Regions:
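Bacterial N-terminal signal peptides that target proteins for export
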Residues: 1-11
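Bacterial N-terminal signal peptides
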Residues: 10-20
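N-terminal secretory-pathway/extracellular module detecting exported/lumenal segments
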Residues: 23-148
Length: 148
């Protein structure tokens, strides 16, 4: 076992796997934001290139650019928030999987943790941004499908 760890080919393979994983993360985090809509207090963008479908569920990164500064539960000011939502296409529900505020617009500046513990599934009201995301992407052939 110890000789395998120091085998140059094994080390090269391990490095390539790590570089590939880092590259995939960087690619998804550098995908362009596409404007999706507007709310009374924010402009909403999605990262279309990183939408994933797993069965009846979608994972979508959403960016909110707030018109006014907001305050986090830890009393830190932020101007934008990036949230990974999971959407249930059958039951029209959403759940936050990850959420960060940023001091500047478009997810720039210092990152502030906004995710609550054990975020609940939320029923999406008609005409909400979440419902529009389901309508736009649940039936879309553009979404990346993963079979698990």
């Amino acid at each position: 076992m110890l000789t395998r760890l120091f085998n140059p080919l094994y080390c090269l393979l391990a490095c390539l796997v790590l570089i590939g994983a880092q590259s995939a993360y960087a690619q998804s985090s550098n995908s362009p934001w596409v404007e999706f809509g507007q709310l009374s207090n924010s402009d909403v963008y999605v990262r279309e290139n990183s939408i994933e479908r797993v069965g009846d569920y979608l994972k979508i990164w959403v960016l909110y650019n707030y018109h006014n500064t907001r305050t986090s539960p830890s009393d830190e000011a932020y101007r934008s928030a990036i949230t990974l939502f999971q959407f249930d296409c059958q039951d029209n529900k959403s759940q936050k999987l990850n959420s960060y505020g940023h001091e500047e617009a478009m997810g720039k500046g210092r990152q502030i943790d906004l995710l609550e513990k054990n975020p609940p599934w939320i029923e999406l009201p008609p005409n909400s941004i979440g419902m529009h995301l389901i309508e736009a992407y649940c039936l879309s052939p553009m979404t990346n499908t993963k079979n698990l």
